[in-house]
Swiss-Prot record:
Claim: Membrane is one of the keywords in the record: yes
Residues that span the membrane, as ranges: 3-23, 43-63, 85-105, 109-129, 178-198, 203-223, 238-258, 269-289
Stated name of the protein: Undecaprenyl-diphosphatase
Record's keyword annotation contains Cytoplasm: no
Function: Catalyzes the dephosphorylation of undecaprenyl diphosphate (UPP). Confers resistance to bacitracin.
Miscellaneous comment as given in the Swiss-Prot or TrEMBL entry: Bacitracin is thought to be involved in the inhibition of peptidoglycan synthesis by sequestering undecaprenyl diphosphate, thereby reducing the pool of lipid carrier available.
Length: 293
């Protein structure tokens, strides 16, 4: 195995694992990293699909007990049935839009300038969402009115994934559609969208993880099938390296993020997005880095 190629696989695998579930856009980072490492040819595109599969398996492993409970309870447990319906409902909008506009989006928006712009806009949206969160609880409601107490200043009305209904799921699914633009971030769109629609930060994050499973798994299978003619046994070693590092880094990232959101907001990610986006635009405009359109 070529050492330089293996090192690229390690770097990209780690980039995928660390960015897939943070609100900073894995696709955007892979587009930029792929260009910097000169690994954005057809083989590189297939490689990205493989490492995404590694990342999603990390989520499946982390939530294996919950997934097993839902699957085993589909026949008789109402809570499991409602949860499965919510995931399906939230998945449909992005699938429909991807089937209709997917080719156009890849042809026109998969470039560093679009990614950088989406980084900045997404960062601003996160800051606005967190500003709204910070105002919650500062407006007091009349004592004795339970409904107003629960909803004062737009306080989260959903504190458990099991409390979601199909309308809530559909709203999150519609928010996920924005993630079709590279640089937006699927997790960022679903988490921030969920928070804006009344989910607590923890619930929005957890539901985003579950929602990633059918979305990324389905996209992986579909893209690998389309690229099957380009698959070669000679590439299995590189694919395996990237897959393993994506799985491990994603597993650690998911566990860390679940702890992080319990006591922190997403402002650090927002500022990172804005700063990173500005840097990419500046390097493009000054010619320091020759980003390809």
């Amino acid at each position: 195995m070529d050492i330089a190629l293996a090192l690229k696989a390690v770097i990209l695998g780690i980039v995928e694992g660390l960015t897939e579930f943070l609100p900073i856009s894995s696709t955007g980072h892979l587009i930029l990293a792929g260009q910097l490492l000169d690994f954005n040819d057809e083989k590189g595109k297939i490689f990205e699909i493989v490492i995404q599969f590694g990342a999603i398996l990390a989520v499946c492993w982390e939530f294996r007990q919950r997934i097993g409970t839902v699957i085993s309870g589909l026949a008789s447990d109402v809570k499991s049935q409602r949860f499965a319906v919510n995931v399906i409902v939230a998945t449909i909008p992005a699938i429909v839009l991807a089937l209709v506009f997917g080719k156009w989006i890849k042809a026109h928006l998969f470039n560093p300038i679009t990614v950088a712009t989406a980084f900045i806009i997404g960062g601003v949206v996160i800051l606005l969402a967190e500003w709204r969160e910070a105002r919650r609880g500062t407006v007091s409601a009349p004592q004795g009115n339970a409904l107003l107490e629960a909803a004062k200043a737009g306080a989260p009305r959903i504190e458990s994934v099991d409390d979601l209904n199909w309308r809530d799921a559909l709203k999150v699914g519609l928010a996920q559609c924005f993630a079709l633009v590279p640089g937006t971030s699927r997790s960022g769109a679903t988490i921030i969208g969920g928070m804006l629609f009344g989910l607590s930060r923890q619930v929005a994050t957890e539901f985003s993880f579950f929602l990633a499973i059918p979305v990324i798994f389905g996209a992986t299978v579909y893209e690998l099938y389309k690229a099957r003619a380009l698959l070669s046994a000679d590439d299995l070693g590189i694919f395996a390296v990237g897959f393993v590092f994506a799985f491990l880094s994603a597993f650690l990232c998911v566990r860390w993020l679940l702890r992080f959101v319990a006591t922190h907001d997403f402002k650090p990610f927002a500022w990172y997005r804005i700063a990173f986006g500005i840097i990419v635009l500046l390097t493009a405009w000054t010619g320091v880095i020759s980003w390809h359109a």
